[in-house]
């Protein structure tokens, strides 16, 4: 995808001489030149305006009106598009979602302050001259020269206050509540990679070092970062590549679906990265974080922090300490497995509905939803950690009243993780603090509810820091229940909280009462009963008289404005009172804002304690949801050990059973991996019989067990798996030019090269994407290799019934089938998995059910009979394996 500036080169700001632009647009271009690859939102009064190429992009992407503005005599009219200041977050969210970086340029003084600044500058310069010398241009802070001949032409000072990129947003409207918003950074050295990622809205900050590009790509696909930082040689300090946009700076091995931001290589130098990280976290060494000897990870982390310092423009980002991890700590799920198992979204339409997350998510808070999502994508290997989660689910399973009580409380808890982050960064608004206060006041009820609990995750909430309870009380006492979004216009602080504020409010009430009395007095004095006292921002307070009564206006009334139906007047007395009221209101608003700021800073000092409690509440919420699912859908607690067994009694698919009417799902057993049990099951049966559902079911039960959840079965004993592999279905990869069969073979090769005896492998229809004989040969060889060389636990679903012969020539292989019942005119799918191999696939019956013409069905039966009569594949395989076995014995 081309850079927007070159895409819309007619209006590229670099094409215009600055001297040809109006002073305001000179200021705009000055800022734009510092951020050429970002969309610049430039505050003008009540709007954020965009100009030139940016305006065309914003108009197109946001579907707002494209207007124009005079840019100067030589240039004429240029494109302009604006958004109201109160809708900034909503529109920024849309732009960021589309992969743009956005620069916010705000007014840092009022027009009145700008005029006063110009007046004082003019006086100062004249005092240094003889009074007759011409005025000299004044050099502004941003380098622009303006001739101050009149205060009316003064430019208001503006400054960049935020640089918003997809991975650096904090505002609620710019985030998805139940998903983390990760910013990642990468550093490469040979085959190795350093990876750092952070969610600045929650403070999470993790690093790792990976031995291959393949491992890196799998981690990126798990994390789904909103933005990935790369070191590059681009001349601009921030170049953002939108999804799919080509660049020689992005290594070919990296997925093109993410936003990549190119940053200068100096940000990723080891010494500078180490210094910056130690300074950020106030430590003398990185050893305590476990990454001192991981130079690539340290470099990536340093580049990430430097990026935050530049984009946040003075906003403090309170990241938690660095956590170092390795892939070997978790059950590894590659992207294809996560996709095939539909963990967080369906393959068909990418929706959450119909996914495992949909079936399990009963969380009451968004932070609990994020925790559950992370757990599903990164199951555990440590049986002790798994057991701690299981113990908590078990207690909440057994104690139904406790679970329901906790969930009722949790329904009133807001996103403590992100609220804490906004308090720590100083960006929280008054409604954030109200939500924080309400949430903190729920914590004592949670602590009381779990006071007698014995499981670890519940016990963690038995003690709430006293300072957080006090903070919650203070927030409730100080702030009104529904404060305004704008912090500088008053209405934030409750009555009776601050003596000085109460005195100022009392004076305002007296002055406004005076206005009411003035209206009554003037009506009586003039005899004009329709006379009113009004106010607007342009003219302040005025006396309004209808046009028909205007001749009765006293001579001391000074006409200020004439409208269609009324005349508006002022008096010296009214203007004097107006000045008093407006000054008092401004002082009152400022005092309220000062009180709010002190309160926000106090909350920010507790960010670490807030986040610690938030993580505990999120975990409790996720576990309570898992317990609720277990109760309502009759799940059991699995037994996990260090063996290799997969013993599932009456297992069910957790998603399908919720998507169909209750009682319709047919449970099935699975036994493999232990002594005297097969390592590999050849699963045959008709189309539509449920083979694919069964193999996914086994994988999901294994995964849920290692998450620490209960599982949909009557009983389950499972050995911990180090990896789960699935190869289920395939489509052409048009982006890389790979056919369906090539994709299938690539995925199969990945499994054969990485599976271990502790892995769980689920294969469906290997070899079906090519000629029958080739496909059968590959399927046989793959199954044989898994059974005899890797000896991992495998279920191999196939329509190649000849593979049933493998059990007679390779040890550790067993045949199972999904049964049907044949009636006179149709077949009934029983969906029951039983020992033995099927000898028919009933594909023609499925075609008949799908509506194939009767003549086609009849012809297919004839052809099938001829093929079966002359096929000697099974005999040949049996003979060749028998000969091979005899040769090996000899």
From Swiss-Prot:
Q: Which GO terms describe its molecular function?
A: ATP binding; ATP-dependent DNA damage sensor activity; damaged DNA binding; mismatched DNA binding
InterPro entries noted in UniProt: DNA_mismatch_repair_MutS (IPR005748), DNA_mismatch_repair_MutS-lik_N (IPR007695), DNA_mismatch_repair_MutS/MSH (IPR017261), DNA_mismatch_repair_MutS_C (IPR000432), DNA_mismatch_repair_MutS_clamp (IPR007861), DNA_mismatch_repair_MutS_core (IPR007696), DNA_mismatch_repair_MutS_N (IPR016151), DNA_mismatch_repair_MutS_sf (IPR036187)
Q: Which UniProt keywords apply?
A: ATP-binding, DNA damage, DNA repair, DNA-binding, Nucleotide-binding
Protein's GO biological process: mismatch repair
Residue sites binding ATP per the record: 685-692
Question: What SMART domains does its record include?
Answer: MUTSac (SM00534), MUTSd (SM00533)
Q: Which Pfam families does the protein's record reference?
A: MutS_I, MutS_II, MutS_III, MutS_IV, MutS_V
Report the GO terms under cellular component. cytosol
Q: Which SUPFAM superfamilies match?
A: DNA repair protein MutS, domain I (SSF55271), DNA repair protein MutS, domain II (SSF53150), DNA repair protein MutS, domain III (SSF48334), P-loop containing nucleoside triphosphate hydrolases (SSF52540)
**Keyword DNA damage attached:** yes
| Cross-referenced PANTHER family | DNA MISMATCH REPAIR PROTEIN MSH1, MITOCHONDRIAL, DNA MISMATCH REPAIR PROTEIN MUTS FAMILY MEMBER
The cross-references to HAMAP family, in alphabetical order and at most eight, read: MutS (MF_00096)
Query: What does the record give as the function of this protein?
Result: This protein is involved in the repair of mismatches in DNA. It is possible that it carries out the mismatch recognition step. This protein has a weak ATPase activity.
Q: Which family does it belong to?
A: Belongs to the DNA mismatch repair MutS family.
| Name of the protein this chain belongs to | DNA mismatch repair protein MutS
């Amino acid at each position: 995808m081309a850079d927007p500036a070159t895409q819309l080169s007619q209006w590229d700001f670099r094409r215009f001489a600055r001297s040809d632009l109006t002073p305001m647009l000179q200021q705009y271009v000055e800022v734009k030149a510092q951020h050429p690859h970002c969309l610049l939102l430039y505050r003008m009064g009540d709007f954020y305006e965009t100009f030139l190429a940016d305006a065309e992009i914003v108009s197109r992407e946001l579907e707002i009106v494209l207007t124009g503005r005079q840019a100067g005599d030589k240039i004429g009219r240029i494109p302009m598009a604006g958004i109201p200041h109160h809708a900034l977050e909503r529109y920024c969210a849309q732009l960021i979602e589309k992969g743009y970086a956005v620069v916010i340029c705000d007014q840092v003084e009022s027009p009145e302050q700008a005029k006063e600044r110009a007046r004082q500058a003019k006086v100062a310069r004249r005092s240094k001259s003889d009074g007759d010398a011409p005025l000299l241009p004044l050099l502004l802070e941003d380098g622009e020269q303006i001739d101050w001949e009149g205060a009316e032409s003064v430019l208001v000072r503006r400054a960049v206050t935020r640089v918003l990129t997809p991975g650096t947003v904090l505002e609620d409207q710019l985030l998805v509540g139940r998903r983390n918003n990760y910013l990642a950074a990468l550093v490469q050295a040979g085959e190795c990679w350093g990876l750092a990622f952070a969610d600045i809205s929650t403070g999470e900050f993790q690093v790792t070092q990976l031995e291959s590009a393949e491992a890196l790509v799998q981690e990126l696909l798990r994390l789904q970062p909103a933005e990935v930082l790369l070191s590059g040689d681009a001349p601009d300090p921030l170049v953002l590549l939108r999804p799919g946009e080509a660049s020689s700076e992005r290594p070919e091995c990296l997925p093109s679906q993410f936003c990549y931001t190119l940053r200068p290589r100096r940000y990723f130098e080891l010494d500078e990265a180490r210094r910056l990280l130690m300074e950020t976290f106030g430590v003398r060494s990185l050893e305590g974080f476990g990454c001192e000897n991981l130079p690539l990870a340290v470099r990536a982390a340093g580049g990430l922090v430097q990026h935050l310092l530049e984009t946040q423009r003075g906003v403090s980002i309170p990241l938690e300490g660095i956590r170092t991890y390795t892939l070997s700590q978790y059950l590894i799920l590659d992207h294809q497995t996560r996709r095939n198992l539909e963990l967080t979204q369906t393959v068909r339409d990418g929706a959450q509905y119909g996914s495992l997350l949909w079936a399990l998510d009963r969380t009451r808070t968004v932070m609990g939803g994020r925790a559950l999502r992370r757990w599903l994508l990164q199951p555990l290997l440590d049986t002790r950690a798994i057991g701690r989660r299981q113990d908590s689910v078990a207690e909440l399973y057994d104690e139904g009243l406790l679970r329901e009580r906790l969930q009722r409380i949790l329904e009133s808890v807001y996103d403590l993780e992100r609220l804490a982050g906004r308090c720590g960064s100083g960006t929280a608004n008054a409604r954030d603090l109200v939500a924080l206060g309400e949430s903190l006041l729920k914590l004592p009820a949670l602590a009381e509810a779990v006071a007698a609990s014995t499981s670890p995750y519940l016990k963690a909430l038995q003690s709430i820091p006293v300072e957080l309870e006090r903070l919650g009380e203070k927030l409730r006492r100080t702030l009104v229940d529904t404060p305004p979004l704008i912090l500088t216009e008053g209405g934030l602080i409750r009555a009776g909280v601050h003596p000085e504020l109460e005195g100022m409010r009392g004076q305002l009430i007296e002055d406004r009462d005076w206005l009411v009395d003035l209206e009554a007095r003037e009506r009586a004095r003039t005899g004009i009963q329709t006379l009113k006292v009004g106010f607007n921002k342009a003219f302040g307070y005025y006396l309004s008289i209808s046009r028909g009564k205007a001749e009765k206006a006293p001579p001391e009334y000074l006409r200020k404005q004439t409208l269609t139906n009324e005349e508006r007047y002022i008096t010296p007395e009214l203007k004097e009172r107006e000045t008093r009221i407006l000054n008092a209101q401004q002082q009152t608003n400022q005092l309220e804002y000062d009180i709010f700021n002190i309160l926000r800073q106090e909350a920010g000092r507790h960010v670490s304690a807030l986040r610690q409690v938030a993580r505990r509440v999120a975990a409790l919420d996720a576990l309570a949801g898992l317990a609720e699912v277990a109760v309502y859908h009759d799940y059991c607690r699995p037994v996990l050990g260090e063996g290799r067994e997969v013993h599932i009694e009456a297992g069910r698919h957790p998603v399908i059973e919720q998507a169909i009417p209750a009682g319709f799902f047919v449970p099935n057993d699975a036994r493999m991996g232990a002594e005297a049990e097969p390592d590999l099951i050849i699963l045959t049966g008709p189309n539509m019989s449920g083979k694919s559902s069964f193999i996914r079911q086994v994988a999901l039960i294994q995964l849920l067990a290692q998450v620490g959840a209960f599982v949909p079965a009557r009983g389950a004993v499972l050995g911990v798996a180090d990896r789960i592999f699935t190869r289920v279905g395939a489509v052409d990869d048009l982006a890389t030019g790979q056919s369906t069969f090539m994709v299938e073979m690539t995925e199969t090769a990945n499994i054969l090269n990485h599976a271990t005896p502790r892995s769980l492998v689920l294969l469906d229809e290997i070899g079906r994407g090519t000629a029958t004989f080739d496909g059968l040969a590959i399927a046989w060889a793959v199954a044989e290799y898994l059974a005899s060389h890797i000896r991992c636990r495998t279920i191999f679903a196939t329509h190649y019934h000849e593979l049933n012969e493998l059990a007679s020539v390779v040890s550790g292989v067993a045949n199972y089938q999904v049964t049907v019942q044949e009636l006179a005119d149709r077949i009934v799918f029983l969906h029951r998995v039983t020992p033995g191999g099927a000898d028919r696939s009933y594909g023609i019956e499925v075609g008949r059910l799908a509506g194939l013409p009767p003549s086609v069905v009849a012809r297919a039966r004839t052809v099938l009979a001829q093929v079966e009569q002359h096929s000697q594949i099974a005999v040949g395989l049996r003979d060749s394996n028998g000969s091979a076995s005899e040769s090996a014995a000899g």
